[in-house]
Amino acid sequence: MSSDMRVHSWSCSYYLDLEKQWVSGKLTLTPHSLKFIVEKTEEVLVGLPLSSIIEIRKESSLFIFGAITVLEKGQTKHWFSSLQPSRNVVFNVIEHFWRELLLSQPGTAANIPSHVTRGQELIGLMANSQKRMEDTAKDLQQQSEQLDSVLKGLEKMESDLDVADRLLTELETPSWWPFGSKFWKMPAEENLKEGVSSTCEPFGKEGVVITVPAIISERAESHSKLGKLTVLVSALEIYDSCSLLLHRFEKEDVDDIKVHSPYEVSIRQRFIGKPDVAYQLISAKMPEVIPILEVQFSSKIELLEDALVLRNKVFASSAERHAASRPKGCTPHRELPTGGQEGEQLQLQKNLPLFSEGEAQELTQILSKMKGLALDTEAELERQDAALDGITVAVDRATLNVDKQNRRMRKLM
């Protein structure tokens, strides 16, 4: 696929350091570069390969707040502001493609200048990942406190329902009955908890076809979040960054899937009398998912505009595989580089060390912290899953109790 394929474009302003002014235009992201095009002249004012970017940050300007800064080789810093629809949306998409490129193409680090080694870049990447995991752990802690408060509220509700049950039993007991308040015994009451628990059994495990990280937005494009898309044999599942299920599309419930580009798809489920459920997903790994969606949802998927290039890529790759499978005698002659710039670059890449001992120790410390955070997060998620199961059972039991007591009160009236 061509590296000039547009992933997304956003309206924004770029700061010209020499002229000390902001210029309006469009920020365009491709799979391997970031470009800023001036609105009036349509001139490409800035063109940055993603492999040359060292750092992407969210910062604030003294004059225009809410900016994104991009630091490239040579310590050149670029400012982008007035981002539409929002700064967070643009930042999430750009950072996602930048990270995926760094992880999938480690050889691009050979061009890093001498003052920024590959080890330093890897440390920065791992430090950002550690910060994200720490933020996720804080969010999980807050979520755990909310679940605990919900459980306490349900326990209080259950005790109140027990009091109401005793009062109703007193009211239902005739004054001439000499054996206390135990007059009628409700047979349904004995098997109440058993019936609720039997209806709350979890779904069986399904075969996972593929799972990819993605930027997720629901209806409003101005709000997006990090997450992942999981393609199952009989469904599509969308999760947030904490691996909590946002929505599950059963295969028969999906009404249409639109492929806006090889990196962007939208999934919709229509309803009558209430808003449709629609999600828009952007991912650097989406070209691996679209062929699977075409097979599973052949009658519901629609390729739009630039997405047609994806099929051309499939045909081209199949032709390349066919050519590679020819016998050696039929393989066309191909000259190998015999020196020059390519040979020097390969030799430089071999001689350049990956990282020093100090950087290796720092990476080891970061990885050990991330391992501990991952284990704590996994344990917390399991605890919250159990808490959610308990909440589900308690809510169903409370609902049945309320319905039963409402019927008893109607009989007394």
Curated annotation (Swiss-Prot):
Q: Name one GO cellular component term.
A: glutamatergic synapse
Cellular compartment(s) = Endomembrane system; Cytoplasm, Perinuclear region
Tell me one GO biological process term.
vesicle-mediated transport in synapse
Domain t-SNARE coiled-coil homology stretches: 109-171, 350-412
The UniProt keywords, alphabetically, are: Coiled coil, Cytoplasm, Membrane, Repeat
Which portions of the sequence form the region Disordered? 321-342
Q: Which residues form a coiled coil?
A: none
Among its keywords, does the record have Cytoplasm? yes
Q: Which residues cross the membrane?
A: none
The record's account of tissue expression is: Ubiquitously expressed with the most abundant expression in the brain. In brain, most highly expressed in the glomerular layer of the olfactory bulb, the cortex, striatum, hippocampus, and colliculi (at protein level).
Quaternary form? Associates with the BLOC-1 complex. Interacts with BLOC1S6. Forms a complex containing SNAP47, VAMP2 and STX1A.
Q: What does this protein do?
A: May play a role in intracellular membrane fusion.
- Could you say which protein family the record assigns here? Belongs to the SVAP1 family.
Q: What is this protein called?
A: Synaptosomal-associated protein 47
